[in-house]
């Protein structure tokens, strides 16, 4: 592979789509805290002055959707009516029904190990050794930039920042290896009375420089900070937001393929979410074991059926053992039936609100980021070679 560029983007917790994701996952967490057998598919829509929460939920739990929604918006930072979206005054509407009994019948089984997949579909997991968290560099640093924006906004370092922001980072590669950062784009919402020169200087000094490795920057790196100038109108006033509309931001920034299913608001019986987490877990352990420098795994399911309909591994020519041997190891060490992967990764717990910002992958405290199978895979592979 010759020299090439690759770009990924991320968005802040105050981006309209991410507000929606966080509300959906906050509802999910509140339900799971009371009812681990709940079935949740929660969708959220946000626009100027209003939030609509809908979906299909079957549970014995009681939750206050309005209060959960307002608290989430308040935590993000929309607490001023001048933003035209305020936790204290926005309308909160909810339209919730129960899960279809036809779907429920296909999922539940007398033997929990034979729990069927909640829907048909295919999911991808990916890992690469180009960063310490075994994630692609472009999406990793795009996430870290918007996370830094939130930090300096909330701790008072840059009090004139507002919640909505976007980042985009273009990395340069040579023969598949990171060699530098070509371009950085950063746009942040701000209050009225900050000048553009002051904003650009502050963003560079307090957000960009503390995050991006200096050895990857050069005199040729291009920086575009609020390139359109003014960014006062943002959040749901500027754009409507919807759960599940940032699926590439949520995963690998376009570096790997995507099955199309979103994550937020879905309980672990939905393989769109849980199997994508499991696929990341498998791919990461393969790379951590040194069996490949890059690994993408696809897994697919039929609704109501426990066993995956396919498992496919792609290592882009970086494998140390054959694809057939890798597939055999995956089948030996990872049970990807829905109930088994939920148990393997301890997914029935209220941990999902945090996943809704700054990516679902690459943060070590999530259970699907463990590399506890790497030694087992390495030892088993050594017996093959």
Curated annotation (Swiss-Prot):
Principal EC category: transferase
GO terms under cellular component: cytoplasm
Residues given in the record as Mg(2+) binding sites: 17
Biological processes annotated in GO: one-carbon metabolic process; S-adenosylmethionine biosynthetic process
Pathway in which the depicted protein is active: Amino-acid biosynthesis; S-adenosyl-L-methionine biosynthesis; S-adenosyl-L-methionine from L-methionine: step 1/1
Alphabetized PROSITE patterns for the sequence: ADOMET_SYNTHASE_1, ADOMET_SYNTHASE_2
Superkingdom assignment: Bacteria
Annotated spans, Flexible loop: 99-109
Family per record: Belongs to the AdoMet synthase family.
Name of the featured protein: S-adenosylmethionine synthase
Organismal lineage: Bacteria, Pseudomonadati, Pseudomonadota, Gammaproteobacteria, Candidatus Palibaumannia
Gene: metK
